[in-house]
């Protein structure tokens, strides 16, 4: 009873802190405000510690690592977003991941808190298929890979949005240049100033897209490595539990598709002609594939991984 109460308190405290963090991120996204950035970072540290405490509490209470159903896996996924945020800030204080990880954490935590049936919050005895030491290795690697791949895909989507808007700006400028024949001196002067301003904005957008492409590549590369480890450990576990390394059930099939899309993305990044926007399109497709892989089997409730099926409120 004490552990259940503590878990309930930690869940709502984490959600409240993440709400404050995302609010400060939105306030400082367009304009740097002294003090709020530090408050946001301290908030993410607090979120990470409290979600860690929540997982440890549930682990002690249930006697196993909390990765047995959708509720527990979503908590771990939220923890994964927070972990990526912490690591990225340690390596490089200024990057774009914080604008992705904080909203991802709050949406995940919000769905955990209010989107699932209360019965799913209760810890249950592991089904025989999950009573293995491979649970920690396989499921944790898969969920951490999902967190990394989702963050990298969102960065690529942001890159596509900026690139698309940049191309629209160029088209609008060309229309303006060819729409007027002779322009008087004052209009020419104003046009030069506008073109100079446009060039500066264009250079800034170029730098921004390069940074987004760089971080997307790094994060997806990490996610691909974790996904590979998760699939390999799952194959070994499947051989022990079911006598076969691979069975092509829905979860395994979509995991393989996710791995393939990630591999294609990494391959396109090695070709200079396919970098940036072209590779970002592949990563954006991967964003949808990852969610199908994660939720698809739970919605269908079929296959060897169907023990995690769920119902919404």
Swiss-Prot record:
Keyword Thylakoid on entry: yes
Main localization, broad class: plastid
Localization per Swiss-Prot or TrEMBL: Plastid, Chloroplast thylakoid membrane
Molecular-function GO term, any one: heme binding
Keyword Chloroplast belongs to the record: yes
GO CC field: chloroplast thylakoid membrane
Keywords for this protein: Chloroplast, Cytochrome c-type biogenesis, Membrane, Plastid, Thylakoid, Transmembrane, Transmembrane helix
Transmembrane parts of this sequence: 13-35, 43-63, 67-87, 96-116, 142-162, 219-239, 252-269, 280-300
Membrane topology according to the record: Multi-pass membrane protein
Entry-linked InterPro entries: Cyt_c_assembly (IPR002541), Cyt_c_biogenesis_CcsA (IPR017562), Cyt_c_biogenesis_CcsA/CcmC (IPR045062)
GO biological process entries: cytochrome complex assembly
Family indicated by similarity: Belongs to the CcmF/CycK/Ccl1/NrfE/CcsA family.
UniProt function note: Required during biogenesis of c-type cytochromes (cytochrome c6 and cytochrome f) at the step of heme attachment.
PANTHER family named in the record: CYTOCHROME B_B6 PROTEIN-RELATED, HEME EXPORTER PROTEIN C
Subunit structure: May interact with Ccs1.
Protein name (record): Cytochrome c biogenesis protein CcsA
Protein encoded by which gene: ccsA
């Amino acid at each position: 009873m004490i552990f259940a109460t503590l878990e309930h308190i930690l869940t709502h405290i984490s959600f409240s802190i993440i709400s404050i963090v995302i609010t400060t991120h939105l306030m400082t996204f367009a304009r740097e405000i002294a003090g709020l950035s530090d408050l946001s970072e301290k908030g993410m540290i607090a979120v990470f510690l409290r979600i860690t405490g929540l997982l440890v509490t549930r682990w002690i209470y249930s006697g196993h690592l909390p990765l047995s159903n959708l509720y527990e896996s979503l908590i771990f996924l939220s923890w994964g977003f927070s972990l990526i945020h912490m690591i990225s800030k340690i390596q490089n204080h200024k990057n774009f991941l914080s604008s992705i990880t904080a909203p991802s954490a709050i949406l995940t935590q919000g769905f955990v808190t209010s989107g699932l049936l209360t019965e799913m919050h209760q810890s249950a005895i592991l089904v025989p298929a999950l009573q293995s030491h491979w649970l920690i290795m396989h499921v944790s690697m898969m969920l951490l890979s999902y967190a990394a791949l989702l963050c990298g895909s969102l960065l690529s989507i942001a890159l596509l949005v900026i690139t698309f808007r940049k191309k629209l700006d160029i088209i609008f400028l060309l229309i303006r240049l060819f729409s007027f024949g002779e322009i008087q001196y004052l209009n020419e002067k104003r046009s030069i100033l506008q073109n100079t301003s446009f060039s500066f904005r264009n250079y800034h957008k170029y730098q921004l897209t390069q940074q987004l492409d760089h971080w997307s590549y790094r994060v997806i590369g990490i996610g691909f490595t974790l996904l590979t480890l998760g699939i390999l450990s799952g194959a070994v576990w499947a051989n022990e539990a079911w006598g076969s390394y691979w069975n092509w059930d829905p979860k395994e099939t979509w995991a393989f598709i996710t791995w393939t899309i990630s591999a294609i993305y990494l391959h396109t990044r090695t070709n200079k002609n396919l970098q940036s926007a072209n590779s970002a399109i592949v990563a954006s497709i991967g964003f949808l594939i990852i969610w199908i892989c994660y939720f698809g089997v739970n919605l269908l409730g079929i296959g060897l991984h169907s023990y995690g099926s769920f119902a919404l409120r």
